[in-house]
Amino acid sequence: MFGSVVFFSESQIVGKVDRTFPNARNDIAWSIMMDADWCPYSQIPKGKYDLGVVTIPKTKPDMDINSFRQWCDKIVVMQEGPHWYFQDYSVEQQFKFIENIRNADWVWCHNKSDVKYYKGLGCKDVRVMRTLMLPEGLDSTQYSSDKEGIILGGNFTSWYSGLDSYLIAHSVNEPITNVSMGRKQPEEDMIPDIKYLPYMSWREWIDECGKYKVGIHMMRTH
């Protein structure tokens, strides 16, 4: 459908990954379905591609996506997180982010509700690409109805709305567990009635979610 495809990433993945890859989050899952290669931002691709997929990194939002055009006929930006998250960047980085998504041949967004927003920012082509999860490698034998406890889906930031999730969980008489994401705040460990898990790969996290009676994740998607 798209010909040869490469995903550019902050990770050090090079080449293709298979369906049992332990950290098969959304972008990796889609790369598997497209039989795409991976190339770190710090390296030069080994050849030319029909399509280059860029998820603008949170740690470097002012990167120039046009720099990838020397290796790719088309460049697409893949949305990560809610469409408003870039407004937490510095003013200069916010304008650079807008410039990047306008320069992309198209934007892949999560939901139909995101399409109007990105078009309103001046993007010339916006398409919905749903979140994809691959079941390979998941242990279905551990799932049962005999469970207890609540698992929260994110930390105490505007991105994950962890406080909203916690307040809902706190109204139920069940032990509360939360995940440790990259944006976890140090003060979260001081909350007495939350047990925190260590940082996990995607597959470890999905397996862990299956151990609890209730999951609460109030992350805003618009």
Predicted regions and their residues:
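N-terminal pre-catalytic "stem/leader" segment of glycosyltransferase-like enzymes
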Residues: 1-74, 105, 117
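Conserved catalytic-core segment of nucleotide-activated headgroup transferases in glycan assembly
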Residues: 18-21, 134-205
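Short, polar loop motifs at secondary-structure junctions
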Residues: 42, 57-60, 110-115, 179-188
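Membrane-proximal helix-turn-helix segments that form the acceptor-binding/catalytic region
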Residues: 89-107
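Donor nucleotide-sugar binding/catalytic pocket of nucleotide-sugar-dependent glycosyltransferases
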Residues: 105-116, 123-139
